[in-house]
Amino acid sequence: MTIKSTSRRSILRGASVAAAATTMGSLMLPLSAQAAARFTISDTDFMLDGQRLQIRCGEMHFARVPREYWQHRLKAIKAMGLNTVCAYLFWNYHEWREGRYDWQGQRDAAEFCKLAQQEGLWVILRPGPYACAEWEMGGLPWWLLKKSGDAFLRTRDANFVQPARRYMKEVGRILGPQQITHGGPILMVQVENEYGFFGEDLDYMRDMKSMLQDAGFDVPLFQCNPTNAVVKSHIDGLFNVVNFGSDPQTGFKALDQVQKGPRMCGEYYSGWFDTWGAPHRRGSANGAVADIQTMLKANGSFSLYMAHGGTSFGLWGGCDRPFRPDTSSYDYDAPISEAGWTGEKFQAYRDGIKPFLPAGETLPPPPPKNPVIAIKPFAFKESCTVAAAMPIKALSVTSPQPIEQYDISRGLVSYRVTLPAGPAGKLEAAKVRDLAWVSIDGKQIGTMDTRYRRFSVDLPARSKPATLEILLYTIARVNFGVEIHDRKGLHGPVLLNGQPLENWDIRAIDFDADAVLPPLMWKTGRAQGAAFWRGGFDVTQSGDTFLDLSGWGQGIVWVNGRCLGRYWSIGPTQTMYLPGPWMKQGHNEVVVLDLTGPRSARIEGLTMPILDKLRPELDLARPPSKVKPALDGVKPAHEGEFAQGSAVQDVKFAQPLKGRQFCLESLDAFDGKQYAAVAELSLLGVDGKTLNQSNWTIVYASSEEAIKEDGGALNAINGQASDFWHTAYSGKAATAPGSKHPHRLIIDLGAEATIAGLRYTPRQGPEGVTGRIKHYRAYVGDHLVKEN
């Protein structure tokens, strides 16, 4: 690749290629005709063999789609009016154990690119090393966490860069031949991912760029960032695209500040992902189509995130910060549904894009819907307790450490220790990642839950020594922010009445890369507590179905030994997508791990998914909300007026203050309405940098919109500017006492901190969106809430 830079704002990039291409009107398609082609990025356009190419792209992750359906989904993407597919690579998917690479079967990235080319689609590759994408640890492999420290990932630290470089060379070996420069469909390759959300070391990004070039990537490279991070993350010689879910004009203006060249949205959000315990997210087709048409009219290109979301099969689903695990369904409310259906939303996108097709290009019809079947209810009559499935041999340690130190990747971990006789007291761990059930002599006495920072339980008095067991379940590693340093397990010291408990035995069921089941000894009858259950169904003809898990508690499902993913009856997802090709004629075995015990040990297969049914009453660890603000007599740390608009704003207090809790009080909004909204709220230390949010929890919010959208308060501290906390505007909560200003959002930081200021990100979108705060107050203290 040749890069000629005439100035910071004028960059010419080119790649001379001999590629498989054909001409359809003014559009070059990656088909099989032998022709010379040249792909360049000029000061105004993407150019393919001297002709303007407007990239109409849609994201699809081959890891989230059964290989048997890759071609079906690619046909649907083509039929929607797109000419390019964008694909992430997930490092941990291909190197789960250090040095062991896997590019076979479901992981065959080269075959996916070949199929895309066969369907007339170009490919934009996003190889990482970091991806995000609501994927386990953002695609980074867990074994990196064997190294100490909470600030080395995504930096120039050798403990990260050296294994990343080895991996990228392997990626180049596999996918280098799929570049357009070698006759393949890959047009461009992304460097890292949204680094502007994470860090400020531009030399790190330069190293990541060089890493790709050294691996043999010779097509144009680019970086993506959200609108508010484009300018600060720009480096010369690297093309920029911008990510947003609304307001394309502002996003494109950010690009104009750093470069000449075609404008492109690298991620336009068709919907949003779901997290356990929060409402199902939806995206407006009308709003999205209008924004896409705005971009196309402005000679812009785009990539739709997602065109087809699919499913986080296995145990690959990620976790939003500070700790909000993602559902196995990655439907995303995308125009092509989780099961590959093309309905009204798909048609709206297709109709909206069609007027912008180059002369001579026509759209193929969407592929036919795959068969869907119902499965009659079937019972589970055999079970095996988790205790019986644990290995006999234990690891003996003085005090528990994160499981990565024991070469355990994820799964179920049993910790046992002998308790002395003694009075009632408190058991407290330094940290628990993620959920744990505490028992004494086989009787459960409490739970620990990282979602609520609940790391302690009350112990009863004991007249004689007793066996304490903590059964721990890892859900997912955080995939966003500094919290990706997410080490799992029971973190010691574990204290009994302030004194360390020592001499623990540890056993684990490590589900590893593909969540393979351990050997299980089945018994007829109903097990008590955490257990595996076995049942099955017979079919004469296979087809897609949706297994209804609403009668179960929390756990994992396998069909014919293949892990479908996690389920949790709190919702919003109540079904699990089972692709037809993963069934077999005759008998199909189903194994369910349930950690809390099913209410009904039966399952049936439905012909429609259940994606939007919340059941908070089944969240056994959820603490009751019994607090209210305690601001009387508390002097504000700062009061002022935010600037109008969507830009990120830093506020410095007159003097730093110490406290464990922080309150943002909204006094009014720019639109004069009664609502408040916050896209992101960060706190600044005395060094001007944002404080670590890994231990933060929301302890109070005036209200939350939960009916028409997910306006939950946790959205204000999850690092995602595209979603937001919004006070209630529908249902009874919209007119309840406290529904008008002032509105308060109170955060517990997990420990005392010195706070020197705040960083406020308003709700994103065009002028006039509701909830942008005008006048405000900020409070710092140790006790800003009290019991009702």
Where are these regions (language model features)?
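Aromatic-lined ligand-binding clefts that engage carbohydrates, nucleic acids, or primary amines
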Residues: 424-439, 468, 537-560, 567-568, ...
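Catalytic-core region of carbohydrate-active enzymes that cleave or remodel glycosidic bonds
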Residues: 245-337, 341
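Aromatic-lined substrate-binding rim segments of carbohydrate-active enzymes
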Residues: 72-79, 86-135, 213
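N-terminal carbohydrate-binding accessory modules
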Residues: 35-84
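Active-site neighborhood of glycoside hydrolase catalytic domains
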Residues: 163-232
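N-terminal export signals
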Residues: 4, 10-32
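Disordered, acidic Ser/Thr/Pro-rich linker "stalks" and the adjacent N-terminal cap
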Residues: 394-398, 560, 624-660, 670-755, ...
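Short beta-strand-plus-loop segments that form exposed binding edges in beta-rich domains
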Residues: 470-475, 592-598, 665-672
